[in-house]
Amino acid sequence: MATFYAVEIPFNYRSTCWFCGEPSDKKIKFPQYDYEINILDHLPLTIPSCKECSSIVNRSAFTSIYHYRDAIKKALTKKHQKVLSIGSNWTKKELEESELEGSAFEGFKRSAWPMFEMMQGRINYQGWPLVVNNQLLVVDSDNDSFEFDGVIYVSLDDAVTHAVKTFFLDEALFTRVLSVLGKNKFSQAIRLCRLYPNLTASNREDVFLEILDSIGL
């Protein structure tokens, strides 16, 4: 039977999920199955997790705990896309000053921004440095995160997926425009492509050329 090593937990982080910062419900084994240890780049671990993070990803065959964390972040982003879209469609001030009427809208005004901030915090949370047997766990990572609207996505591709769903973009058009403008102009690409939500293969090329002409390219 394999030995799993407990990570050291700083006093300020006791009872905290290492993956998202919420209160932890349990300590999970990583990887889940002994035979998956063969692909690990570090010792097998036990680590505190909340209920959602411990169950949101079905597989645990990853080369490191950091890649497993990335998978959890991606799953949380997908599951809570509607909550995260609040921060993309509103600012806190806009919500407070909006003239939405009715009990349902009043409830939305009160709860929407705190819900977004809570989920934003969970997605952005990086956990504390992992120490096992007095040794800092150092593993090379090829992760290339991307930040948009205050949320740190695991990758540019995840940010694109979120933007397409949130702003009802034509994905083929958006990714093509983004490739021309570059990821540093992610917001501009969204603004340009929001004008053309429903495209067909026959008119997508014309729209793309129209966008390029509008920005002088």
Features from the language model and the residues they span:
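Short, well-ordered helical secondary-structure segments
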Residues: 4-7, 17, 37, 103-106, ...
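C-terminal, charged low-complexity interaction regions
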Residues: 117-217
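Generic ordered-secondary-structure signal
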Residues: 12, 21, 28-34, 74, ...
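N-terminal cysteine/histidine-rich coordination modules
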Residues: 1-83
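Short flanking/linker segments adjacent to small metal-binding domains or redox-active Cys/His motifs
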Residues: 89-129
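Generic alpha-helix detector with strongest preference for long hydrophobic helices that associate
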Residues: 31, 38, 96-100, 173, ...
